[in-house]
A protein has these predicted regions:
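N-terminal "cap/leader" segments of large eukaryotic alpha-helical scaffolds
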Residues: 2-42
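HEAT-repeat alpha-solenoid elements in large eukaryotic scaffold proteins
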Residues: 6-17, 41-51, 98-103, 127-133
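Amphipathic alpha-helical scaffolding segments comprising HEAT/armadillo-like alpha-solenoid repeats
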Residues: 27-39, 61-76, 95-128, 147-159, ...
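Eukaryotic acidic, Ser/Thr-rich intrinsically disordered low-complexity regions
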Residues: 199-231
């Protein structure tokens, strides 16, 4: 019978880079960083978590284009806690650090290349993180700003009754906060549909009851449209 004990890797590596060091391409040469990068694909969530912490603590996540790319691939990680940490790391890498310094251009360019091509699965993963950890909203908005087509995926979520009420609400909110103006017509149609059904329900009390999702989301749709239409 196989043992149930899970091997937890140990990464021994001091912080690789100080704030004054912006050279990239050397982080991958350090054994601890390389081992941690490989463990990002480990099927055991706790191992992936330790690997991610190592890459952040050594500074490699902000310095190495390869490491930043590998971290970005975990945006669809099934573990919500780990995915939330990925969002925080990536969002922070796209902003100045405590000293006001940006990550190397090679890192931001690599992230822009990957994040600009996000699909529904990654976008949905970001919305789930927002529901789970609302305090990560700035990082999520920063990431979505890079993906010009994310608005299309978000409006699909907002329209889908298969999604939970909170997912739909957060999708609508993100559309307004990032500023996806192309989503205005779809939101207007959603508003008209909701208002028409509400009016019909009020004039015909014998009609089937309105879904709670639609009635509850109408204020969110109106608020989003107000923000998107403002100068």
């Amino acid at each position: 019978m196989k043992s149930d004990t899970t091997h937890k890797p140990s990464y021994t590596q001091p912080r690789l880079f100080g704030p004054e060091s912006t050279s990239s391409g050397v982080a991958e040469l350090f054994p601890a960083v390389w081992n941690a990068a490989e463990d990002l694909a480990n099927p055991i969530a706790s191992v992936r978590q330790l690997a991610l912490e190592c890459l952040e603590n050594t500074g490699a996540s902000r310095i190495s284009p390869l490491v930043s790319y590998l971290i970005a691939t975990r945006l669809n990680d099934p573990d919500i806690e780990l995915r939330s940490q990925v969002v925080r790391i990536l969002g922070n890498a796209l902003a100045p650090d405590a000293n006001g310094d940006m990550a190397p251009e090679a890192v931001t360019s690599q992230l822009a290349y990957y994040l600009s091509d996000m699909r529904t699965r990654q976008i949905f993963g970001l919305v789930e993180v927002l529901v789970h950890k609302p305090e990560l909203a700035p990082q999520i908005i920063r990431i979505l700003n890079i993906c010009v087509f994310a608005g299309n995926h978000l409006i699909e979520m907002a329209n889908s009754r298969k999604m939970s009420l909170e997912i739909r609400r957060k999708a609508i909110w993100l559309i307004s906060q990032v500023g996806y103006l192309e989503a205005i017509p779809a939101l207007e149609r959603l508003q008209i549909r909701m208002e028409t059904r509400i009016t019909g329900q009020q004039s015909m009390p014998f009609a089937p009851p309105l879904g709670v999702d639609d009635s509850d989301l109408l204020p969110d749709v109106k608020s989003a449209l107000l923000i998107l239409r403002s100068p």
